[in-house]
């Protein structure tokens, strides 16, 4: 082997070897244990970022480790290729989304190969290809036939100037990103899939996902939001209209003092017909899109309708208000307000001087003070007529029973989860396979006309989808009748909800999935991706799997057994103030810093000599210009170094702080391993290790080796604490560096140690380990080498080093047999000269013995 570690040479050679040998190509082998490891597929944005590198390195480490355990390992990759960014880039670059996307895929594919990830490239998919989305379209038509797909009107962001629908990210401060026109909310027909039909399954099956992070499962439980309560009907005074609300707190029902309805509620429209001020307020509410997450912190606004509801149990009139915090798409679009016992209702009532009626006592039996806030705890009822004195459970049931008995209430289980709206008024997506006949009938596109192919040779004007601006595209015939195609495209979460299953049979053309292949590989054994996907992608991913199961395509209930959510990658962020006081962000690569003795940045200057302000560590992003290009780092240090740093710098699920000094440290370690291997191989071949004749020092080193193997095996396989696995290997290499290399047995032990270290490092740094394995004359390629197994007998200690204290002060150390009794240890201690002199002429009054570690003799 060459003396110097040159990653640029060995990495290219090893990658070529993998490509020529098709090392990572796999097929189904029914007699062999399978392992399916998958990282979330990337969007082909143009270049990999460090977040990608971290995600895919984790997946590759797990895949290579499992392969060394003898399993048939599938690790595929593909491209989540549809989406809005391609449309913006196409307009900006005066091209179409397709060529921009395919060029990005080619570039990023090469970047992935440079990082040495062991993918089966024969299984690569791009979700924008018709041979992929045709089956998605086919499946949608089957869901429609089963009654799981429907169309209804739903609100979208509408730019009246461009006459187009805008995605949420295209609305900036309430205005169109392109022309700055104020955006309106508009109701248009859209397609939905009934995810609510699977709400209970999605909730209950979370309990079976024992190897998913608790945080993800909690987020999904909250998103599904199962609640038990009562749906209650109010009569509207002086009207035949009725008003329905849902509550999980019927115990507070006697404290209702007003009812709030959404701006889109029919009663709101009815009241606004003769009330221009109310009509304006409703328009304001409907044109302001508020994310549900912001509901708690936004300013609560409302306006009285002039209508009243009749409380069904006490007959009192309660005012009906339109409120901006009530959403039409949630529940019934109306809520009963109990300001005495709900903080939001209290704030609204206080703002508009509405009545507040307490009906729940404090825990000590006193009446609550509602002057500063609502009393939201559960307790015994008062002010509630026949229900006074009842506790929460008794009151819940008594009031619910009374409402049911009177025919104005119904016990219901409700879900926060809403059906999945899959229509997008964009071009770059899979066309929705539905057509409208001349008589207005809407039917699925017949199977023999699938796929409905998205035209790729289009001109983007940045305003209207080419599918909508070209009426000829929509024209088709079905059974000889003229028909119009749907011009909306699928939400891109559709493609990423089933790609993992298509990887099992990407070339299969007889159906959506090849049952034999899908059921051999599925479920995924290990899924790796960011926690930001917890309630969108990961919910749809689980839902789609259950849909495919119920269609007979797969047999498992869940798509992935184990989930690892890697943390974000952070980097230093710097800026200076521009001429208008705005922050101009400077790349950390272009900044020189001075640090204090604790390593804190105290001064920073950019490469133009400007003082810049340090804004701390933040997530790598384009907006803060603090992304580090992985390719630059690979060219500078090698892929193995970048991979090693990514796995060592932080636990996988925690944030990782990018520090180039840490990358340099990883590089130094690999150079040290290379140098130790080089010096060892330069001395020629080694003899066989004779375990029976090892000295105590040699036994100690071999014990450390096999303890390290046991720890690294557990850290990678069970605990997934990859950073501690690497730390253990580094510690072992430090011990090896200090070990003598004089005798044949010394060198034989070094050979055993290096062969084990190279295999343990291989999942992290495969290129250098491939090369070192050959230099050390390991059997075959390391790609097919087995994972090292800890020798239990080597880890057994023949002797123990015991510290001897007299009256708590250390007076000596003795070596005793590992199984020595306390009496034997005391005898041996008494023979130790340094100890014996402190025992001369005194009486041992007490003995404290910690087996195999410490002997403390208390004398007097």
From Swiss-Prot:
Its EC number is 6.1.1.4. Its main location: cytoplasm. CDD domains: Anticodon_Ia_Leu_BEm, LeuRS_core. ATP binds at residue 622. Gene3D superfamilies: 2.20.28.290, 3.10.20.590, HUPs (3.40.50.620), Isoleucyl-tRNA Synthetase, Domain 1 (1.10.730.10), Valyl/Leucyl/Isoleucyl-tRNA synthetase, editing domain (3.90.740.10). GO terms for biological process: leucyl-tRNA aminoacylation. InterPro entries: aa-tRNA-synth_I_CS, aa-tRNA-synth_Ia, Leu-tRNA-ligase, Leu_tRNA-synth_edit, M/V/L/I-tRNA-synth_anticd-bd, Methionyl/Leucyl_tRNA_Synth, Rossmann-like_a/b/a_fold, tRNAsynth_Ia_anticodon-bd. One of its GO terms (cellular component) is cytosol. PANTHER family: LEUCINE--TRNA LIGASE, MITOCHONDRIAL, LEUCYL-TRNA SYNTHETASE. Keywords: Aminoacyl-tRNA synthetase, ATP-binding, Cytoplasm, Ligase, Nucleotide-binding, Protein biosynthesis. Belongs to the class-I aminoacyl-tRNA synthetase family. It is found in: Cytoplasm. The lineage of its organism: Bacteria, Pseudomonadati, Pseudomonadota, Gammaproteobacteria, Enterobacterales. This is Leucine--tRNA ligase. The keyword Ribonucleoprotein does not apply. Pfam families: Anticodon_1, tRNA-synt_1, tRNA-synt_1_2, tRNA-synt_1g. A motif ('HIGH' region) lies at residues 42-52. The keyword Nucleotide-binding applies. It catalyses: tRNA(Leu) + L-leucine + ATP = L-leucyl-tRNA(Leu) + AMP + diphosphate. It comes from Pectobacterium carotovorum subsp. carotovorum (strain PC1). GO terms for molecular function: aminoacyl-tRNA deacylase activity; ATP binding; leucine-tRNA ligase activity. NCBIfam families: leuS_bact. A motif ('KMSKS' region) lies at residues 619-623.
